[in-house]
Amino acid sequence: MGRQAALAVTLLFVTSFTGCFGVESDGNLFDEDHEKEPLRINHIQMKGTHNSYHVEPLFSPTREYMYTHQTLDLQASQQGVRQFELDVWWDVRGGLRVYHNQYDSGTTCPTFEDCLGTLLEWSNENPMHHPLFIWVEPKDWPEQAADVTTTLEISGLLGDIEQEISNFWPLNQTITPDDVRGDGDNLRDAIGENGWPL
């Protein structure tokens, strides 16, 4: 896994809404006999946060780190956030950890499981919510020396992330890129042929 490889894993938490009511030009709802087209994932616009777990460090080395997000559940309930981005690192002492980098490690949910648990609890308490999108960005460590900079490859990190998701989050409440791809050769062709999920 290269450092330049940006992400990878997306989760869509299934909601009970599979369609929406249309509105006529005069502002009235269509009557029940009017044909309603199901709402697909790509019809949804949402508010998202970057480094969704972030807590401003006590001594910030740069102005870019000078912000703090509310906890994930409060972002969802109070701010209407439906897209979250998590940076996931593998730590030999603690498994999958969530933070920005070694100089900016403040976080509202220290482990990947903590983050998933917070969102799962909110989702279960709000069963009619629109889908949540979770972007998971796997991270690896740069090893720097006077004359060389290399990347420490973390074998199996993606597999560990996918395993933790499948162990922790109910499969009937997730949609992954593999689910959308199905039997297609690739994600792009599958979407072109079948469209985005309802």
Task: List each model region and its residues.
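Secretory targeting signatures
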Residues: M1-L29
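Catalytic cores of phosphodiester-bond hydrolases, prominently lipid phosphodiesterases
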Residues: N28-L198
